[in-house]
C-alpha cells in the first residue's frame, strides 16, 4: 500500500464484512483520517429473510464505532438497477451468464462510491479487496493479491487509470488468515463472519425463484448433442454451461449412469443441450472469442500477445495467445483445452502478477 500524507482523508467502503473492517483499521492505525461509507444497492423489504443488508449495516456501524470513525450510509439502488442489474437481466434473457460483481466494481464501487467519497473531501477510496495497486511513473498497474486463494483482481479488471489512481487496497498484501486474526485480536464482532458468496442481490434464496420475478421463463426441450429429446427445462436463462444440478434427467434406462451436464444453449430454438460425463469432449474448448475489451494501462499490449488468462475467478492461470480480430474483438487460443467456457463471463489476461484487463466471452 502506498504512503500518503498523514492529513489526507481516505474513505473506506465498509460492507460489514471482516475484510473492509480490517482495511479501515489498517488505515486508521497508519494515522490517516478515515471515514466509512456503507452502500445500499438494493431496495428490499426489511423482513426479507434472504437479504443480509440490515445485519451488514448493523455490523458496519459496530465496527465504525469500535475503530472510532464516522459512518455514512449512501443509497445507490437506482444506479445499481440501471447500470448493473438491468444489464444482467438483458444477458440472462439472451442465454448468457453475466458476472454482476465485475460491473458493480466498475459502475458502482469505483464510480458512484468514489465520486461520493470525493464530495465528502476524501482523496482516495479504500476497499477490502484482495489485490494490489502499483504506481509506475504515474501509470497504475493492478496486481494480484499476496493471497492467491483470495485474489480478486479478476473482478477488478474493468477499472481504469483514474479509478486505480484514486483507490487503495489496504489488505492486498495480507493473507485472509492474517485478516481474521487481526479482527479477532481487536475484538471485532465480525471476525468469524462468513464470506459473502453468490450473486449479491439474490442472497441465499433460490436463483430460479428470484429470476422468475423479473423475466418470463419459457420452458423448452432438453436435447442430447445428437439431437435426442430427453427432458424439459424451465427456461434456459436458469442454466449455465457445465451445470449438473437441477436437470432432472438422471436414471434414464436408455443411458449410462454418468451424470448429465449442460454443454450449450440454443437460444433461437429455446433448447438446452446436454452431454454425459464430466470429461465429455464437448465440454472442452481450446479457443474463444471475446468482445467489450478493456485494457487497464493507457496503451494496449502488442499482438499477438502470449500471456496467461482466466475464464473464471478461481481458475489457475492458463497459457494462451491473444490475437486482435478488430477494434472490439480478440481471439484467444489456449495451450490446453478449457472446461465449460461460458458466454457472458469474463476472460481476464495476466502477465506475471499484473492484471492487464479482459473482455466478455461471446
From Swiss-Prot:
Segments of this protein annotated with the region Interaction with target base in tRNA: 99-101
Disulfide bonds: 104-200
TM spans (from-to): none
MF terms (GO), sorted A to Z: ATP binding; tRNA binding; tRNA-uridine 2-sulfurtransferase activity
Region (Interaction with tRNA): 150-152
A single cellular component GO annotation: cytoplasm
Cellular location(s): Cytoplasm
Catalytic activity: S-sulfanyl-L-cysteinyl-[protein] + uridine(34) in tRNA + AH2 + ATP = 2-thiouridine(34) in tRNA + L-cysteinyl-[protein] + A + AMP + diphosphate + H(+)
GO terms under biological process: tRNA wobble position uridine thiolation
Source domain of life: Bacteria
Record bears the keyword Hydrolase: no
Site description Interaction with tRNA, residues in chain: 129, 345
Keyword RNA-binding: yes
Enzyme nomenclature, EC number: 2.8.1.13
Record InterPro entries: MnmA-like, MnmA-like_C, MnmA-like_central, MnmA-like_central_sf, Rossmann-like_a/b/a_fold
Assigned keywords, A-Z: ATP-binding, Cytoplasm, Disulfide bond, Nucleotide-binding, RNA-binding, Transferase, tRNA processing, tRNA-binding
Entry's family note: Belongs to the MnmA/TRMU family.
Reported function: Catalyzes the 2-thiolation of uridine at the wobble position (U34) of tRNA, leading to the formation of s(2)U34.
NCBIfam families: PRK00143.1, trmU
Name this protein carries in UniProt: tRNA-specific 2-thiouridylase MnmA
Lineage: Bacteria, Pseudomonadati, Pseudomonadota, Gammaproteobacteria, Legionellales
Amino acid at each position: 500500500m502506498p504512503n500518503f500524507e498523514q492529513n489526507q482523508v481516505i474513505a473506506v467502503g465498509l460492507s460489514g464484512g471482516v475484510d473492509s473492517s480490517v482495511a479501515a483499521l489498517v488505515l486508521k492505525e497508519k494515522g490517516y483520517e478515515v471515514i466509512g461509507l456503507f452502500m445500499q444497492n438494493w431496495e428490499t423489504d426489511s423482513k426479507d429473510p434472504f437479504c443480509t443488508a440490515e445485519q451488514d449495516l448493523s455490523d458496519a456501524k459496530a465496527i465504525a464505532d469500535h475503530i472510532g470513525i464516522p459512518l455514512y450510509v449512501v443509497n445507490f439502488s437506482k444506479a445499481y438497477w440501471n447500470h448493473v442489474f438491468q444489464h444482467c437481466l438483458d444477458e440472462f434473457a439472451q442465454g448468457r451468464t453475466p458476472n454482476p460483481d465485475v460491473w458493480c466494481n466498475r459502475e458502482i464501487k469505483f464510480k458512484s462510491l468514489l465520486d461520493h467519497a470525493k464530495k465528502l473531501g476524501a482523496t482516495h477510496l479504500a476497499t477490502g479487496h484482495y489485490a494490489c495497486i502499483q504506481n509506475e511513473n504515474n501509470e497504475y498497474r493492478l496486481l494480484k493479491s499476496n493471497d492467491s486463494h483470495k485474489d480478486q483482481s479478476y473482478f477488478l479488471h474493468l477499472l481504469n487509470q483514474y479509478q486505480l489512481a484514486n483507490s487503495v487496497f489496504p489488505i492486498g498484501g495480507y493473507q485472509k488468515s492474517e485478516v481474521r486474526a487481526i479482527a479477532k485480536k481487536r475484538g471485532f464482532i465480525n471476525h468469524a463472519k462468513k464470506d459473502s458468496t453468490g450473486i449479491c442481490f439474490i442472497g441465499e434464496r433460490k436463483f430460479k425463484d428470484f429470476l422468475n420475478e423479473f423475466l418470463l421463463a419459457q420452458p423448452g426441450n432438453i436435447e442430447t448433442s445428437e439431437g435426442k429429446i430427453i427432458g424439459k427445462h424451465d427456461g434456459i436463462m436458469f442454466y449455465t454451461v457445465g451445470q449438473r444440478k437441477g436437470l432432472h434427467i438422471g436414471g434414464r434406462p436408455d443411458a449410462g449412469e454418468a451424470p448429465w451436464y449442460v454443454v450449450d444453449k440454443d437460444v433461437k430454438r429455446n433448447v438446452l443441450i446436454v452431454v454425459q460425463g464430466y470429461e465429455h469432449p464437448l465440454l472442452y474448448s481450446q479457443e474463444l472469442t471475446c468482445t467489450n475489451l478493456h485494457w487497464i494501462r493507457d496503451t494496449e499490449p502488442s499482438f499477438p500477445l502470449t500471456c496467461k488468462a482466466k475464464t473464471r475467478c478461481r481458475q489457475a492461470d492458463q497459457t494462451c495467445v491473444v490475437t486482435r480480430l478488430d477494434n472490439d474483438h480478440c481471439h484467444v487460443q489456449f495451450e490446453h483445452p478449457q472446461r465449460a467456457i461460458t458466454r457472458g463471463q469474463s476472460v481476464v489476461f495476466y502477465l506475471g502478477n499484473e492484471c492487464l484487463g479482459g473482455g466478455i466471452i461471446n
